[in-house]
Amino acid sequence: MIKDTPFDINALKAKRRYEINKGKKNFDVKRIRPSEHRDELYEVLMAAYQGWPEKYRPTVNEEKFKNSINSWGDLIVYGGFDKVEGKLCAFSYLKEYPNYLEFSVLRARPDSERSGINATMVVAILEDYNERLGKAFYINDGERAIRHETAFQDYLEKYFGFRKAYCRLNIQYQWWVKAIVKTIWPFRKIFVANNKIGSIISSVMKMEECCKNKQN
C-alpha cells in the first residue's frame, strides 16, 4: 500500500474532512526524540496491544522495549499529544530512504481513536512530505496484512489516497518447513486462527495460497 501523490484535504468528502479536522482540534502532532518519552511510549504501546485479539497480541518486556529505543536513532518518530492534558496518545516511527518513506509503526491509545488521533497522525506525516510526494518519492505502508486483522490499510486508501501496488509473493522455505507445509496443505481449512499457533499456521496457509493462485 503506497501513497505517491500529494495529499489534498479539500478533495475529500465533507464527512472525511470533518473527521480529520476533529483530530486536529484534539491533538498536537510533532516529531519527538523518543529517548525523552520512554515511559509514555511504553504506556501507549501496551494500551494499543490491549485492544488486539489475544491470539496475536505480543508479549512485551518493559525493560527490553525501553532499551530498544536506543536503536531508534535512524528513525523518524512522531508523537501525538492531547491538547488538554499534554499526554502522549499515539506514536509512529518511520524510516526514510532516498526514494521512499517506510511507514513502519503507528500505535495509539484506543480511547483516543474516537477523538481522531489516527487521522491526525497520518495527516501530520503527509503534510511534512507533501512537497516530495509524486516527485519520484512515495510512502510505503507495507504489504497486505495476513495475520493481523486490521482495516487500517482500507482506512489509508479511503481517507488519504493510498493505493495498492501489486506485486508477486515468493516464499523460500527451509526444506523441513516445506515438507510440513506440503503435508498439511490439503487440511488447511481445519486450522482456525483462534490461538497463537493456529493463527501462525493459518497465516502461512494464506500466503501459500497466494503463491499458488499467482502460479495458476
Region spans (language model):
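Glycine/small-residue-rich hydrophobic helix-like segments
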Residues: Y97-Y159
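A conserved beta-strand-loop-helix scaffold within acyl/acetyltransferase catalytic domains
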Residues: I2-I20, K24-E113, V123, D128-N130
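Active-site/acyl-donor-binding loops of N-acyltransferases
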Residues: M1-F7, R132, A136-N216
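Hydrophobic transmembrane alpha-helix bundles
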Residues: K13-R17, N67-V77, F91-E102, A119, ...
